[in-house]
UniProtKB/Swiss-Prot annotation:
Ubiquitin is encoded by 16 different genes. Ubiquitin is generally synthesized as a polyubiquitin precursor with tandem head to tail repeats. Often, there is one to three additional amino acids after the last repeat, removed in the mature protein. Alternatively, ubiquitin extension protein is synthesized as a single copy of ubiquitin fused to a ribosomal protein (either eL40 or eS31) or to a ubiquitin-related protein (either RUB1 or RUB2). Following translation, extension protein is cleaved from ubiquitin. One of its GO terms (biological process) is ubiquitin-dependent protein catabolic process. One of its GO terms (cellular component) is plant-type vacuole. It comes from the Eukaryota. It comes from Arabidopsis thaliana. Keywords: Cytoplasm, Isopeptide bond, Nucleus, Repeat, Ubl conjugation pathway. The keyword DNA repair does not apply. This is Polyubiquitin 9. It holds the Pfam family ubiquitin.
Length: 322
């Protein structure tokens, strides 16, 4: 019985093909050649993440009416790519752009003995799905993938909010910051674009993995919210000068000192910031942690090299009494 199936190309073009379930994959490739002019030996057809063998039939792969195959082109001669492990070792692989991620994992298993189900491959900050091809991710000659190992059973980490609530998350070291934000959204309903995650005083970049930041079992991240549009605050110096800064409540004190350095050329390690009589600590502490809001005024005093801060006691009292 005749039916229609579809073949999707790497350019997102969809080809509709009239077939019967007893057609071989070779027959299907011949039909694609008739429609698109692509030689049979340059075609690779993929369905449900599997590369289809020429001699098998559509029925063998349970390909039914309106199924979608993916058409990838076989590069003549293939190409080399590199896979970097967490230990810094680099593996060289011979591949084709039409190879699926499954195929790549099998090649890694052949070289390194790591079972595919324990592998996670990352490229350009994205975890690669098994059924997709290298071409789907625009992985080209001499591209470098990153290999991280999937921990059996994963691990637990904690996320602490500004309200001191602690969220427990089940993660793996290969999860990206994006993945973690999605898990937080599932639990707390906070959109990822409003989240900032801080660990060891550093803001985590979306495309990086937990392993990149050495985040391990039972580590604690700090969650601060990104204010849409930010806010202005002021910084008064001992000379009476007022600096205006554009900030967000999720900015760390380190971030604020960096902004002051940009404006005033004062090194962060020479700055001390005071608000409401309290010295602000570097690291993961944010403006929100100190309840610093729109148009708040901080006081800047300079740390003398090798000694105390000039005017520190005077300014502390001034701030405390204001």
């Amino acid at each position: 019985m005749s039916m229609q199936i579809h073949a999707k190309t790497l350019t997102e073009k969809t080809i509709t093909i009239d077939v019967v379930s007893s057609d071989t994959i070779n027959n299907v490739k011949a039909k694609i050649q008739d429609i698109e002019g692509i030689p049979l030996d340059q075609q690779r057809l993929i369905f449900s993440g599997k590369l289809l063998d020429d001699g098998r039939t559509l029925a063998d792969y349970s390909i039914q009416k309106d199924s979608i195959l993916h058409l990838a082109l076989r590069l003549r001669g293939g190409m080399q790519i590199f896979v970097k492990t967490l230990t810094g070792k680099t593996i060289t692989l011979e591949v084709e752009s039409s190879d699926t991620i499954d195929n790549v994992k099998a090649k890694i298993q052949d070289k390194e003995g790591v079972p595919p189900d324990q592998q996670r491959l990352i490229f350009a900050g994205k975890q690669l799905d098994d059924g997709r091809t290298l071409a789907d991710y625009n992985i080209q000659k001499e591209s470098t993938l990153h290999l991280v190992l999937r921990l059996r059973g994963g691990m637990q980490i904690f996320v602490r909010t500004l309200t001191r609530k602690t969220i427990a998350l089940e993660v793996e070291s290969s999860d990206t910051t994006d993945n973690v934000k999605a898990k937080i959204q599932d639990k707390e309903g906070i959109p990822p674009d409003q989240q900032r995650l801080i660990f060891a005083g550093k803001q985590l970049e979306d495309g990086r993995t937990l392993a990149d930041y050495n985040i391990q079992k039972e580590s604690t991240l700090h969650l601060v919210l990104r204010l849409c549009g930010g806010m202005q605050i002021f910084v008064n110096t001992l000379t009476g000068k007022t600096i205006t800064l554009e900030v967000e409540s999720s900015d760390t004190i380190d971030n604020v000192k960096a902004k002051i350095q940009d404006k005033e050329r004062i090194q962060p390690d020479q700055q001390r910031l005071i608000f409401a009589g309290e010295q602000l600590e570097d690291g993961y502490y944010t403006l929100a942690d100190y309840n610093i809001q729109k148009e708040s005024t901080l006081h800047l005093v300079l740390r003398l090299r090798g000694g105390e801060c000039f005017g520190f006691i005077f300014l502390f009292l001034l701030c405390f009494n204001s």
